[in-house]
Amino acid sequence: GSAMITPRFDGGGPHTPFGASRGGELGVRAWAVPGLLQSSAPRPMGPVEIRFVGSGDAFGSRGRFQTCIAVRSPDDFFLIDCGASSLVALRQQGIEPREVSKVFLTHLHGDHFGGLPFLLLDGQYASKRTEPITIVGPPGLEERLTQAREVLFPGSSKVTPNFDIRLVEIKPRAPITVDDVVVTAFPAAHFSGAPSYSLRVETAGKTFVYSGDTQWTDTLLEASADADLFACECYVFDKDVPLHNSYARIMENRSRMTCKRLIVTHMNEDMLSRVGEIELEAAEDGKTVIL
């Protein structure tokens, strides 16, 4: 059945109740409304550490891990995307998977969300997680995540975990607040069987934007406006490839961007072979930026 619950987060203050249904395979489902899961406690400002845990494409070009960006503020730790290789990448870089409080997903392709079945399984059996995890993504998240879990580990989505799994499906240009992270989704030009997004994430007074996978679209200018850091996918050097961005397109539009810092990521083999000749800062696995 359905129940109104008042989630308690680490702030301990009053929180906005939201409608949720228990009874589904994934514990608690929340529908995004502005102000969702918002804490009233004052929060510290910065520093915010952005770590490119995985900066690679879907094919592991040059041995890079698939997309996974970790964000650490003074009192929180969460991921943006969690590609299939992310659990290995986190452990290799000395990060405890059970520390992850939230995962924000740009889109539902395996190199961006395929690590979730492993992260959730780890929480149940290896890390012995007890704290809730909130997963935020596009419409279709609940169905696709359940399918992925069942294909990889049959029965895993039906086991009642020792921790709450909270799913939040978000819509474009409708900012929501989860704990004290404000996230806004912008439409991306990328087919993934569900809406694909660029994500603007504001936490501890800093703004980080990740393009997700997308062809060049001027929406990227809107999404990244005045951001402290904009991580932009740069799959190819100068070809026009459907669904993906290129270094040439980014450079054509660089002067129109108002972000304070730009880093390119999600590069294919050809792009990586030319990374020494580009005029932009490039991500690599383990690269850390302090905002």
Q: What kind of region is each of these model predictions?
A:
Residues 3-5, 17, 30, 36-209, ...:
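Binuclear metal-dependent hydrolase catalytic cores
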Residues 10-11, 16:
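Short hydrophobic alpha-helical segments enriched in small aliphatic residues
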Residues 7, 27, 40, 212, ...:
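Residue-level detector of intrinsically disordered/flexible regions characterized by low predicted structural confidence
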